[in-house]
């Protein structure tokens, strides 16, 4: 029996989907434990790019089960679109994909609330994806939410109507005007609910407990990144769930002492989407080049990601709070061609040099301190072994390992699953 955990160590978009896809053949079960359709996991193989929003990244492999855990929030309409998009691959979703009854549903009015809330903030907006994630988690913690298991109840539509009416009253409190046709949105929602009912709903904590007893191997898949965690991220510019290792326990019902390996995924540089502090953001040519070469656009929102140098202070913090045992570095190929690379090793903070992430990392409080490295010219995308990598990249990797005190086991040199080097 093995339970391992894979999560992002930055502000999301680290490349988790690709690594889950690469590792999937080792596991019987892939289980998503938090988040919703605000984050997309991108996989690329056989020359085709696939973006999954809610469905676990193991869905393309034949011999495993994919679970959507209780910590996930599901938009039935988005989910239906995702399922429809997989139809051409002739996947047996009925046997491969199961959903926790305790996962919460995103209602159309959750999305409307999200839009009204964000619009009301003006310049103080946090950069919400407007997918209804925040309002859904608010209803969850406020004990008002509707869960997947409620679909099986005879009074499901009554429960829906009561909550939707409440949301409409709440929207009126925002001093903004948003245009919507709720009747159309609800028609689409209930049609999607009928499709959702074609899949099996389970008590996922019991299912996973029995799977562990039977010796099955499980990979817990996180969404977004550790610096977006609602407790440990750059609050309030965060998501609404726990994206850290603890979220796997609460989002699946797996005991902490059952988790063996914690795989931490990070980019060779740093990116962020939307608002919020970003100490190593580069506003000059380097950031522009990273965005262009790395194709740094959100897989769900399409927004261009902000780019900058690797922040080791933030990376160490994420490794610490997650108990990471293995690191996997993504997009090493994007840094090819830079004469000089920079890595932030500490901050100047209120007149002192510190090597930890403080409470407030707004630009007026933080100045990154950099160590510089010689870059490399070689194109990495065709390389298949660690020995082939240029010395300068190996020096870069060695420095990160020594600073973070966790080994880098995988180096990604391209988007395709084949462009993955094991160290």
UniProtKB/Swiss-Prot annotation:
Any one GO biological process: IMP metabolic process
Cofactor(s) this protein cannot do without: Mg(2+)
Native source organism of the sequence: Flavobacterium psychrophilum (strain ATCC 49511 / DSM 21280 / CIP 103535 / JIP02/86)
Known pathway: Purine metabolism; AMP biosynthesis via de novo pathway; AMP from IMP: step 1/2
Recorded GO CC terms: cytoplasm
InterPro entries: Adenylosuccin_syn_GTP-bd (IPR018220), Adenylosuccin_syn_Lys_AS (IPR033128), Adenylosuccinate_synth_dom1 (IPR042109), Adenylosuccinate_synth_dom2 (IPR042110), Adenylosuccinate_synth_dom3 (IPR042111), Adenylosuccinate_synthetase (IPR001114), P-loop_NTPase (IPR027417)
Residues that coordinate or bind Mg(2+): 13, 40
Binding-site residues for GTP, renumbered to this chain: 12-18, 40-42, 305, 331-333, 412-414
Binding residues annotated for substrate, in chain numbering: 299-305
Keywords (A to Z) from UniProt: Cytoplasm, GTP-binding, Ligase, Magnesium, Metal-binding, Nucleotide-binding, Purine biosynthesis
NCBIfam families registered for this protein in UniProt: PRK01117.1, purA
Gene of this entry: purA
Stated name of the protein: Adenylosuccinate synthetase
Residues annotated as catalytic: 13 (proton acceptor), 41 (proton donor)
Pfam name, any one: Adenylsucc_synt
């Amino acid at each position: 029996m093995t339970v391992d955990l894979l999560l992002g160590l930055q502000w999301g978009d680290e490349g988790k989907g690709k690594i889950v896809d690469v590792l999937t053949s080792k596991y019987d079960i892939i289980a998503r434990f938090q988040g919703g359709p605000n984050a997309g996991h991108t996989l690329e193989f056989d020359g085709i790019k696939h973006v999954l929003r809610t469905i676990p990244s193991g869905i393309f492999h034949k011999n495993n089960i994919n679970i959507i855990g209780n910590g996930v929030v599901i938009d039935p309409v988005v989910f239906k679109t995702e399922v429809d998009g997989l139809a051409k691959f002739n996947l047996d979703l009925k046997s491969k994909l199961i959903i926790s009854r305790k996962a919460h549903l995103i209602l159309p009015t959750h999305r409307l609330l999200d839009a009204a809330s964000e619009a009301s903030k003006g310049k103080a907006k946090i950069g919400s994806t407007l997918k209804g994630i925040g309002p859904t988690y608010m209803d969850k913690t406020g004990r008002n939410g509707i869960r997947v298991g409620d679909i099986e109840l005879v009074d499901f539509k009554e429960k829906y109507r009561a909550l939707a009416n409440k949301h409409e009253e709440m929207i009126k409190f925002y001093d903004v005007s948003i245009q919507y046709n709720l009747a159309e949105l609800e028609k689409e929602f209930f049609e999607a609910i009928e499709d959702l009912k074609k899949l099996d709903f389970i008590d996922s904590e019991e299912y996973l407990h029995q799977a562990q007893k039977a010796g099955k191997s499980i990979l817990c898949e996180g969404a977004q990144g550790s610096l977006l965690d609602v407790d440990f991220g750059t609050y309030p510019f965060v998501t609404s769930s726990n994206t850290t290792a603890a979220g796997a326990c609460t989002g699946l019902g797996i005991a902490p002492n059952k988790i063996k390996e914690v795989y931490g995924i990070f980019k060779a540089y740093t990116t962020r989407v939307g608002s919020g502090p970003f100490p190593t953001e580069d506003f000059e040519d380097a950031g522009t080049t990273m965005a262009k070469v790395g194709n740094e656009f959100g897989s769900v929102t399409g927004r261009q990601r902000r780019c900058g140098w690797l922040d080791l202070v933030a990376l160490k913090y994420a490794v610490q709070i997650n108990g990471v045992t293995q690191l996997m570095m993504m997009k090493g190929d994007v840094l090819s061609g830079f004469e000089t690379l920079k890595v932030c090793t500490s901050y100047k903070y209120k007149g002192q040099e510190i090597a930890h992430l403080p409470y407030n990392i707004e630009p007026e409080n933080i100045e990154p301190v950099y160590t510089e490295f010689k870059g490399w010219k070689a194109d990495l995308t065709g390389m298949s072994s660690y020995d082939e990598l240029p010395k300068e990249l190996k020096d870069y990797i060695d420095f990160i390992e020594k600073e973070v005190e966790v080994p880098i086991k995988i180096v990604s040199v391209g988007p395709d699953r084949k462009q993955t080097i094991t160290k």
